[in-house]
Amino acid sequence: MSRTLTPLLDRVCEPQDLRAFPESDLARLADELRAETIDVVSVTGGHLGAGLGVIELTVALHYVFNTPEDRIIWDVGHQAYPHKILTGRREKIRTLRQEGGLSGFTKRSESVYDPFGAGHSSTSISAGLGMAVASALKAEKRRNIVAVIGDGAMSAGMAYEAMNNAGALNARLIVVLNDNDMSIAPPTGAMSAHLARLVSRPAYRSLRERVKVLGEKLPKFFLDKARRSEEFARGFLVGGTLFEELGFYYVGPIDGHNLKHLLPVLKNVREYPTGPVLIHVVTHKGKGYAPAEASLDKYHGVNRFDIITGKQVKASSNVLPYTKVFSKALREEASYDDKIVAITAAMPTGTGLDFFAEKFPERMFDVGIAEQHAVTFAAGMACEGYKPFVAIYSTFLQRAYDQIIHDVSIQKLPVRFAIDRAGFVGADGATHAGSFDIVFLTTLPEFVVMAPSDEVELMHMVRTAAAYDQGPISFRYPRGEGIGMDLPQRGEILEIGKGRILHEGNRIALVCFGTRISEVLVAADELSAEGLSTTVADARFAKPLDKDLMRRLAREHEVLVTIEEGAIGGFGAHLLQFLAQEGLLEHGLKVRTLKLPDEYLNHGSQEKVLSRIGLDAVGIVNTVFSALGRKIRTVQRVRV
């Protein structure tokens, strides 16, 4: 179908063009921006619902504030596609989340209109406060700093830490609370809009401050009564008492889709000389696109789709994704053991725990965007004899590292960590890559670290974790599908710290930790065809290492190559340290480690990027050839 005409949007290259429009044109411009956003994501896939929910807010912010001199910080960045279209990136917007194209999140290196990069939630207020204080220290002319944060992100403690600090500093910071679940308070029509305009006027705020000064001279009894009366009135009408207690001047709630309500409030707040302000806007995810509005997840993250029907393009496959294999295995284990509980930090669908909750709703806990709390909550349950499984993306586990050490590992509490999206994740790029969990977990004493080579092994590791009560244990698995193995009804319990041999050879040893095993097996076939007898080992455990197996491989082979989808300092590094301590590097053994490069990998196709960095069969074969002094060449791919 032909694309929707966008005559107004076509005139906008950067926000200064937008600011030349009369206010009467902005609603039509917002409609065009919404149509363009829908069209873009229908082609690229990505996050749609959040962006559709902030179309009018995005237009209003760039219209009122002098970006990029004024700073707009988008929390998480899921909602920033319309922002990118308005800020000079429309020509490249259909490269979104593709290798060499635009990021799916805000990114400082991409545009001056992205003052702070994002991907994880709840960072915007802290970053904005830092910018506001820095601006004040430099004695710059008044610069507006605006942090836009969703109500979901407000469930994280970091947001309140920042607000508490901003209130204490009386910093000149504007926070826009995008309440897209109406979880705090709905707007109440004309009265709410009128009140928001009234209380946002500088004259009202100035009068309020003067009354406060005068009130300090009154007896405490009268002062308390006056304060409580105002708090009751404003809290009853607009729900802002909590934010006022944190030192913010509260305005709202207002309809975030009504430009006639948004513009005067933003203009009023723009003129405030001091103090932090919170503007509470209520929006609806997926606004203006019926399939998104009707969907339970509001099209939060989607594949390419048909605009007319909303039907997403999905590859047909009977192979289960690793996430579904995990959730199936955990639900099976829970049917045998009523002490098994599951914990997620606001990702029940992404981690597969929604499937677990269908059968055991009372044993699944979604704690919100609160990874630190999730881990210590699990530790508390472990203290009382329960078997908590914390299902979490590798990238988000980073946020709870102190809790992993202090609350779990030191106390040797049997918390189970199911680490999803391990390794390179593809289109979401550097902020979501699961690069570091092997490194930061294998450094912890007596912490068991596993990785399955396929989906059957994943089922074994779920059962192994359920049976292990001696301390913390983890297993990591990637985004995407398995390799199509027939799945048992239930996994088996593995012996802790024992790997396995998949193919016996006598010259080359390929030791894989994780799901690159299929590429390793292809490489082994190619090496064998070249006359290089090859052993393939599935390590299973990075910690504890299978020391007997590693000694044998080191003594019986000329070249040993480790393969893992993790950062420097992981499985290969631990194996090298062991070999050095054992004196196994002193008799001619050639060791090479294949891993993720020492850089932050940008978005792109999983298969293409992993091939480019050498974590495929071609890269493995060429690594062996290089170790042997053979000429590196392009290898014909053989699929098994």
Curated annotation (Swiss-Prot):
Cofactor binding note: Binds 1 Mg(2+) ion per subunit.
Superkingdom as given in the UniProt entry: Bacteria
InterPro entries: Dxylulose-5-P_synthase, THDP-binding, Transketo_C/PFOR_II, Transketolase-like_Pyr-bd, Transketolase_C, Transketolase_CS
Biological-process GO terms, alphabetical: 1-deoxy-D-xylulose 5-phosphate biosynthetic process; glyceraldehyde-3-phosphate metabolic process; terpenoid biosynthetic process; thiamine biosynthetic process
Residues that bind Mg(2+): D151, N180
Pathway given in the UniProt record: Metabolic intermediate biosynthesis; 1-deoxy-D-xylulose 5-phosphate biosynthesis; 1-deoxy-D-xylulose 5-phosphate from D-glyceraldehyde 3-phosphate and pyruvate: step 1/1
UniProt EC number: 2.2.1.7
Assembly mode: Homodimer.
Name of the protein in question: 1-deoxy-D-xylulose-5-phosphate synthase
Natural source organism: Bartonella henselae (strain ATCC 49882 / DSM 28221 / CCUG 30454 / Houston 1) (Rochalimaea henselae)
Gene label: dxs
